[in-house]
């Protein structure tokens, strides 16, 4: 029974980590577009998310050679 509870808790933690990363990658793209073009996707090229402690670093790149980083903070409810 203890082994089952341990395996179940590990699975829940892994699921939480994956869901935070997916949400943060989506937030990364939205923040890039919102901060530079006020929601216009015309010049958007790519957004890459890298998880870090208590948040993540978001790399934004646009077709007009504009590149910058944004730091996203995880907020768990």
Curated annotation (Swiss-Prot):
<keyword id="KW-0964">Secreted</keyword>
<dbReference type="GO" id="GO:0005576">
    <property type="term" value="C:extracellular region"/>
</dbReference>
<keyword id="KW-0732">Signal</keyword>
<comment type="similarity">
    <text>Belongs to the scolopendra neurotoxin 3 family.</text>
</comment>
<protein>
    <recommendedName>
        <fullName>Putative neurotoxin 3</fullName>
    </recommendedName>
</protein>
<keyword id="KW-0800">Toxin</keyword>
<keyword id="KW-0528">Neurotoxin</keyword>
<feature type="propeptide">
    <location>
        <begin position="26"/>
        <end position="46"/>
    </location>
</feature>
<keyword id="KW-1015">Disulfide bond</keyword>
<dbReference type="GO" id="GO:0090729">
    <property type="term" value="F:toxin activity"/>
</dbReference>
<feature type="signal peptide">
    <location>
        <begin position="1"/>
        <end position="25"/>
    </location>
</feature>
